[in-house]
Amino acid sequence: MKLCGFDIGLNQPFFLIAGPCVVESEQLQMDTAGTLKEITSSLGIPFIFKSSYDKANRSSGTSFRGPGMVKGLEILAKVKRELNLPLLTDVHSEADIATVASVVDVLQTPAFLCRQTDFIHAVAQSGKPVNIKKGQFLAPGDMKNVIDKARAAAREKGLNEDNFMACERGASFGYNNLVSDMRSLAIMRETNAPVVFDATHSVQLPGGQGTSSGGQREMVPVLARAAVAVGVAGLFMETHPDPAKALSDGPNAVPLKHMKALLETLLELDRVTKKNGYLENSFGA
């Protein structure tokens, strides 16, 4: 699959989607994006900057949601223009899709909306590449149905059917907890879409702090290493200069100062994993 000018897939080094969870300020976006560009450029990692203009899914009605679509897209557009970076952001309603697609390079669907057929159809018909997140409630094999819906919608409009990625972000494991079954990354290859692993939302503790979600950021490197060892096309990681002060998902954000070391480790694992292909493909049932 071609994405933002580079090739992605299991026969390519992983690409990275990274940035703060939510647009907090123009300065934070520019500084974080600039640092990530320096890191990924030095390591040769294809990079897409991400951040959300609105976090519609929050634990509490008083939680910070973001600057809104108009201001948020204005800030993201500046990042793209001044740093020459491709952008990804999530959309939560059909009404926003056209406006958002006019600014960003890649759309993302929230995990909770993966079974909303009309929404998936609308996003798929935007003409943009889409990172489709697997719901925490969904079996990995069921993502084939979701990707098939997206492809059918694109085909109906004469658009590129190979414009979709399947993203794993953990599965509900009792109350206020998620678990990552690494088999899902191999199972989701059956969609014939590039598989992306969300290493930061996978360590989230949803609603685990009463009016906000908790997280185990110390487990991000653990799960990221495991995912790369399985073999993925891309990684998704939220990062922040000071996670303790982040306005959204700070407990599961990677401290920006640690991103380079983590990515260096993951690159080495990626090379080993992809050197001789995937033995599981020849093992059979």
Swiss-Prot record:
Gene3D superfamilies hit by this protein: Aldolase class I
Biological pathway: Carbohydrate biosynthesis; 3-deoxy-D-manno-octulosonate biosynthesis; 3-deoxy-D-manno-octulosonate from D-ribulose 5-phosphate: step 2/3; Bacterial outer membrane biogenesis; lipopolysaccharide biosynthesis
SUPFAM superfamilies given in the database record: Aldolase (SSF51569)
Keywords associated with the record: Cytoplasm, Lipopolysaccharide biosynthesis, Transferase
Subcellular location as annotated: Cytoplasm
GO molecular function: 3-deoxy-8-phosphooctulonate synthase activity
A Pfam cross-reference name: DAHP_synth_1
Main location: cytoplasm
GO annotation, biological process: keto-3-deoxy-D-manno-octulosonic acid biosynthetic process
Entry EC number(s): 2.5.1.55
Catalysis performed (reactions): D-arabinose 5-phosphate + phosphoenolpyruvate + H2O = 3-deoxy-alpha-D-manno-2-octulosonate-8-phosphate + phosphate
Transferase as UniProt keyword: yes
Alphabetical list of HAMAP family matching this protein: KDO8P_synth
Family: Belongs to the KdsA family.
Protein name: 2-dehydro-3-deoxyphosphooctonate aldolase
Organism, scientific name: Polaromonas sp. (strain JS666 / ATCC BAA-500)
